[in-house]
UniProtKB/Swiss-Prot annotation:
Residues 4-182 form the Guanylate kinase-like domain. Essential for recycling GMP and indirectly, cGMP. PANTHER family: GUANYLATE KINASE, GUANYLATE KINASE-RELATED. It catalyses: GMP + ATP = GDP + ADP. The lineage of its organism: Bacteria, Bacillati, Actinomycetota, Rubrobacteria, Rubrobacterales. GO terms for molecular function: ATP binding; guanylate kinase activity. It holds the Pfam family Guanylate_kin. This is Guanylate kinase.
Amino acid sequence: MRRGRLIVVSGPSGAGKSTLIRAALDAVPQLAYSVSATTRAPRPGEVNGRDYIFLSREEFERWIREGRFLEWAEYSGNLYGTPAHRVEEYLESGLSVILEIELQGARKVRRKRPDAVMIFVRAPSLEETRRRLEGRATESEDAVQRRLATAVEEVAARDEFDCEVVNDDYERAREEMIEIMRRIVAGGDPC
């Protein structure tokens, strides 16, 4: 059996990464999703173990000390990390694994695993990113401003990625993401 491939999906908050990933997971059975751990509070409707593994800062720091993360980083005041053991299990079973992580984490994965396929997802403009973040109604204006400042840095780094999906039209972006994932699991050039 052929080993799966590691896929990193990154981009600014509000780009639509999660929605596009869910569409790809539904369409491509050879994919698995790596559930990240985080110290941030759950959003309405999020389920522990499905959307994230929600940990206290103390628990998360213990996992760091124990070497349980493939990568971890701090983003907007919260810690996020990829549990290593689950990723390895998926890859060994022949599934390609999607990691949805921020730029710092994506860079760490690229250093550790240069064979990882890196996909950058973004909204068509900073104004659209702002509109989407404000539409969530889950964050303060200060938090939105911090995420927008981070988005500028993230978009500036998009050339570090193998593929870019501009989520300006959901159906088009969805089809593009699914096609990229199909090429990855087939062992081909993704972009």
